[in-house]
Amino acid sequence: MVKGKILFGDVFSALRCLEDNSISVALTSPPYWRQRDYGFKGQIGREKTPEEYIGRLIVIFRELRAKLKDDGVFFLNIGDKYKNRYGKSHLLQIPYRLAAHMIKDGWKLLDIIIWYKPNHMPSSVKDRFTNTYEPVLVFGKSDENIYTKKHPVLKIPLQQTKWKHTAVFPEKLVSSLLSRCNLKDGDYILDPFAGTGTTGAVVKKMKYQLYPKDLNVILIEKGKKFLDIITERTGIKEIKELKSSEYTWEPVNDKLAFSEDKPLIIIEDTHGETFIAKNSEEFSRIIMGMLSEEFQDFHREDAVYFFGVKNWKLSDLVLPGLLIDHGFILRNMIIIEDGSSWYPVFMLVKDTTRVNYKFYIDRIRKKPKTVLPEKWNQEDFIGLIVNDNLSKKPRKGEVVDIISTYSQDNFPKIVAVSWEDDNISLELCLNPRKDEFIMESLQFTCPHCGTQLIDTYDPLGDNICYNCQKEIYGKNSLPILKESKEIIESLESVENGEYQVGENIKPQYQKRCKESKSKFAGMERMNWGASPGARKTIIGDSFSKMRLYRLDQPTIARYLNIYMKKNDLRIKDITQALPPEYKHTVGHWFRKDFGGSIPLPEDVTLLEEILKLDKEFARILKRSVLKLQTVKHSLKGKNPGDFLELEENKLKEYLTKTYMPPSYYIKK
């Protein structure tokens, strides 16, 4: 059992109960902004804006500072958050903005430790580096303190626990942080946001280590559901319930500020830039240069920028997060481990709704480690839930029969799905061994020379075939679409003149099929819920119905615009030819900016006659598929994440790969 107590109540009231200058180390991870709801009123992290969240924490940590000894240390682990903006989410830089305001409030910033998580969860994100680290801010009341600086990067895996708390930080992280302090027997350790009591559990174990420490711990927790867990982990029996105290706070106000130095305008590549500044002053000049007309006129609107700084200051970590009000979005703060230190590189893109930026993550992926079964047991799939989000009205269904399988591993290829709206359909399933490659297998070929095109339609520049140098995506030069032989053969085994895979079967047609020699023969109609319920496969728990191909929206919009012009139509004419509910939808199909959308399969059926669409083009737009939903890395490899161990001379080449146009990249 560890010596200490649990204060059950809000953090501000609990801190006020503590004696001033009594705590040697405070160590905590408060609720992140807008991350989750812990189920009680007045909880921290539910504020409307990040500015309110930061302002509130400043007030709380001001109270904490009064309780800290003069040589005490405060470890603050706090995660960042993205804020959506026109489809491009902006990294808010909450930890570093908070640190800057805490310094203004009287704290001393002693260190910023990077906690890298080697076993971070895989992510499907493709337009930036996935998040793999969190900062630990180290504060003190004075320069004379018990903190000992060590390597500022900790590589500690996430820790699995039996407790239902999604934000448990590992015991090893707590022990590593405490080991950096010169602690004495009898010292008090405080965790003002105790959660499941990890800090207390570590302090308890320190009593039995090789060089034992007999420490006291105070844990503050507002969530009642965590009290039993804390008691179990720490053995602390003393729980004091507190009444809430009212307190007020003001949102912070951050403004972009520059020195009087001359801007440094980087203009080398219209598609993007990579530059590592030597120091804070040079970095500030680069950011100033980004706001200049010369910089913005030179670069394409879909360019990507990587600007870093070696000998950085805290203000450099704050600055890029403030560019959201000046025309740029911060997508990543990438950490580069550099010997005994680290430095940041910021991924920035233009804040525009006209086009999406060009970022090719596939070029730098790491080799995947996902292991799939050699053979699949077909029984695992009967009764499996199917979620259809490709229809106008989302619906659920379940697999009722397996028509055919892939020969190499018995994974279902064609299945019958019974839907909750009393329809039934045959669906093509993607084999997890090659699902991503199939979804990106649609080829666009030059109508002049037949060369497979590399670049998608460019709404900002000239569209020229890189081989024959002739115009493409014009009125009479739309690229020809080609499907893979594997897909064509799989679908032709089922489809005939009357049916396309993925379509609902009408009751009368279904009855006719059962009496024929078709793939539906002998299949009995099943009532919703009557089949074996929602079995889970080895690595997945449902299928999702989605588009067979990953289509570039501006490219599809270009095709539709050409067809509209060929038929001498306007958007107004198309809207009038469709049912009234399409009034606010049609215009989005022809937009090539962030407001654009691709018609759903049922929409394409209506557009075929109006626009006289090429049958093959329409068929491709209507193609659908079932994909097994499971947590696995991309077959192309793992997103490398925002923590890199690269020498500076290799870093520029590495990052430049991510925005280099495909035709240039292949030549390299």
Curated annotation (Swiss-Prot):
Species per Swiss-Prot/TrEMBL record: Methanothermobacter wolfeii
Signal peptide extent: none
GO molecular function: DNA binding; N-methyltransferase activity; site-specific DNA-methyltransferase (cytosine-N4-specific) activity
GO biological process: DNA restriction-modification system; methylation
Entry keywords, A to Z: DNA-binding, Methyltransferase, Restriction system, S-adenosyl-L-methionine, Transferase
Pfam families: N6_N4_Mtase
Listed InterPro entries: DNA_methylase_N4/N6, MeTrfase_CN4_CS, RM_Methyltransferase, SAM-dependent_MTases_sf
Domain of life where this protein originates: Archaea
Name used for this protein in its record: Type II methyltransferase M.MwoI
Similarity remark: Belongs to the N(4)/N(6)-methyltransferase family. N(4) subfamily.
Enzyme Commission designation: 2.1.1.113
Class of enzymatic activity (EC top level): transferase
PROSITE patterns xref list: N4_MTASE
Reactions it catalyzes: a 2'-deoxycytidine in DNA + S-adenosyl-L-methionine = an N(4)-methyl-2'-deoxycytidine in DNA + S-adenosyl-L-homocysteine + H(+)
